[in-house]
A protein has these predicted regions:
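OB-fold and OB-like single-stranded nucleic-acid-recognition modules
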Residues: 1-205
Length: 205
């Protein structure tokens, strides 16, 4: 395993188990399970983050609903076929379980990657400046993770001018955001959840 590639993508999460681990898939005879972690924000709101964890880390663990746990890992993506369309699915891949730390930031992510689509700068109805961008982060075995990021204010203006291929270091938190999607032929929009990095620090790398 390339240590440098591990350093490209680092996540620390500490929160409460919202759903019991459910079997997800198997790779080379190793089972992987998925669960949701509920993590508080300073504002009082919460983020619900999907986590993928190996059966090897679950040995001797129960992970009851409401139990607080801490993990270190990586923010990863994969493509899933849904209604004959490829959908980008995001999850935190747990690499290790940690001791709880009341002093720690409960939700922090750091990635080194490349802008892989032209950034989209916009202003909200409340005059907040926002830029959405998609980052490609190299992973072992010639794979890449594609991570949506959202920047604010002066950071939004800065990255809004950058070109595809620019290498950036990004620090922030993983957030879950509900939105409504209008489906063809349906009267009521469908409530969906997006996962992205809310960027607090960005710099050229």
């Amino acid at each position: 395993m390339n240590h440098e590639l591990l350093e490209n993508n680092k996540v620390y999460l500490q929160g409460k188990v919202l759903s019991k681990p459910e079997f997800s898939h198997e790779v080379l005879n190793e089972g992987f399970y998925s669960l949701n972690l509920k993590i508080p924000r300073l504002s009082g709101q919460t983020d619900v983050i999907p986590v993928t964890i190996s059966e090897r880390l679950l040995v001797g663990k129960n992970f009851e609903i409401g139990e607080e746990i801490a993990i270190k890992g990586q923010f990863r993506s994969y493509n899933k076929l849904e209604d004959d369309k490829s959908k980008l699915v995001l999850t935190v891949f747990a690499r290790e379980l940690c001791n709880l730390d009341s002093e720690a930031n409960p939700n922090i992510v750091e990635i080194f990657g490349y802008i892989c689509k032209p950034p989209i700068y916009r202003t909200t109805p409340f005059n907040r400046e926002i830029t959405d961008m998609l980052m490609a982060v190299n992973r072992s075995y010639n794979k890449s993770d594609y991570i949506p990021c959202i920047t604010w204010g002066r950071n939004a203006r800065f990255v809004g001018e950058l070109k595809v291929g620019t290498k950036l270091e990004i620090v922030g938190r993983i957030q879950s955001r509900e939105y409504l999607k209008k489906l063809e032929g349906e009267e009521q929009p469908l409530k969906k959840v997006a996962y992205e990095i809310s960027v607090s620090k960005v710099s050229l790398n």
